[in-house]
Amino acid sequence: MTTIMLVRHGRTAWNREERFRGRVDLPLDELGLKQAEAVGRRVAAAWQPAAVYTSPLRRTQQTASAIARACGLETTIHTGLLDIDYGALAGLTPEEAAEQYPALARAWRGAPHTVQFPGGESLVDVLRRAQMALAESLTSHPAQTLVLVTHVVVCRLLLCAVLGLDSSHFWHFEPAAASISVFQISPERNILLSVNDTCHLAGIGA
């Protein structure tokens, strides 16, 4: 049985502003850097991962590097862990998106699995490559503990997939910045151990 630690990256300025981020290559802000160090300490203290995989974007690489340093590992980049491509909506606030793309914004909140972002991706696209990244990591490290550092959209989709839920349940999960969700995978069954664990962030501000 392989244990997967699914980590969302630390906070960025656009997380504070609630903008559509996607492929925009944002760095962690000051709090996000502290969150990354905290999640690194937590992983090193509680688990012994064999590998740390990360999306290639800067915010995830910064978070993954903090975890890898704490665990004495190197990071491995996998493009399958990239955030969704929001296309024309990248950089917009929810209010701006609702004004410029009202039908799309309503669908995104009410039926996200039906949305194709103009010039971007759908949840089907993201899930396909995220599952490929997960499968490749499982093949490379059978019966070990792995860290996957990625984005909120990928976290939601993989949590749905692990529980056998389709992407219409996307909004049922709300992984916080620098949160850890843990599940185990075997040929017989998937077991969800924890979701959105942020106890390591206590006392570092918000």
Regions found by a protein language model. Name each.
Residues 2-3, 11-77:
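Active-site-proximal alpha-helix that buttresses catalytic centers in soluble enzyme cores
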Residues 13, 59-61, 83-85, 154-156:
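Short, active-site-adjacent cap segments at secondary-structure transitions
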Residues 27, 69-131, 184, 191-194, ...:
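Phosphate-handling substructures
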Residues 54-55, 128, 149-150:
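Short beta-strand scaffold positions
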Residues 61, 69-71, 132-191:
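Active-site-adjacent alpha-helix immediately C-terminal to a catalytic or transition-state-stabilizing loop
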